[in-house]
Amino acid sequence: MVLSELAARLNCAEYKNWVKAGHCLLLLRSCLQGFVGREVLSFHRGLLAAAPGLGPRAVCRGGSRCSPRARQFQPQCQVCAEWKREILRHHVNRNGDVHWGNCRPGRWPVDAWEVAKAFMPRGLADKQGPEECDAVALLSLINSCDHFVVDRKKVTEVIKCRNEIMHSSEMKVSSTWLRDFQMKIQNFLNEFKNIPEIVAVYSRIEQLLTSDWAVHIPEEDQRDGCECEMGTYLSESQVNEIEMQLLKEKLQEIYLQAEEQEVLPEELSNRLEVVKEFLRNNEDLRNGLTEDMQKLDSLCLHQKLDSQEPGRQTPDRKA
């Protein structure tokens, strides 16, 4: 029975905390999307006003030679070279890693979002707008682009919490951790007191983190789901959808780490096995993640075969 599996999972307080923290990140993502979308357009307009020569009439002459790869980008035309300089001028981390591989430089003169992706983490080349991004992508943009006037320490604290959620091998966090997370995410939200949709989420997050989800196995005349002591109601399917989104994001994180060989093969294998064991015990979640798991298994198998080729060595962990 699907609900009994959900009840068993949420009977573990630390797993419930993990889901609640993840739900907060989903709420944060939803309230930032519109704001970020508007600000990216404003930022792009400002760039073009300051440097009209970079506008729609500017055309990349380098073609495929102006295609970036991961953190490497050596423009082969004047337009892309000037755009790169302009982006770096506004990049807080201009001397560090910039994920140029997210971008299509030929679109920079006409597409604000292609510019925004230069300020974001790796793996976002196919994202067409803020509505397709997770919370950490939007937070990283806010943190890395000097167009956003915020206390960057507050942004990095939330990013750090998000990474701890995604990197939690057993998908569990303590109640002490959750209280600390609540303080940090609310400190961040306080930076946007003039943005109505962000202000509206503040109380929802506070209510979520201070309430206790209780899962009930319903009788015939009762509704399925979770009911908080403060009266907020989440149906079983809503809770399940939150879990699915968090697990998909976690698997995507593992995939990117595997693709860029950021962790040792044994560590990667251990992380993957923990998720597989969890899904073996939770069929309701496993069925919706089959494609994600197959994609990850295929990459890991391919890398394993590559490492076994004569003369090939497993790369050292990246710094």
Curated annotation (Swiss-Prot):
Q: Can you list the GO cellular component terms from the UniProt entry? A: mitochondrion
**UniProt KW keywords:** Methylation, Phosphoprotein
Q: Which residues carry this modification: Omega-N-methylarginine?
A: R61
Methyltransferase recorded as keyword: no
Q: Name one Pfam family in it.
A: DUF4559
InterPro entries, alphabetized: DUF4559
Leader peptide range in chain numbering: none
Q: Which residues carry this modification: Phosphothreonine?
A: T314
Which Cys residues form disulphide pairs?
A: none
Query: PANTHER family per the record?
Result: RGD1565685 PROTEIN
Write the protein's name: Uncharacterized protein CXorf38
What organism is recorded for this protein? Homo sapiens
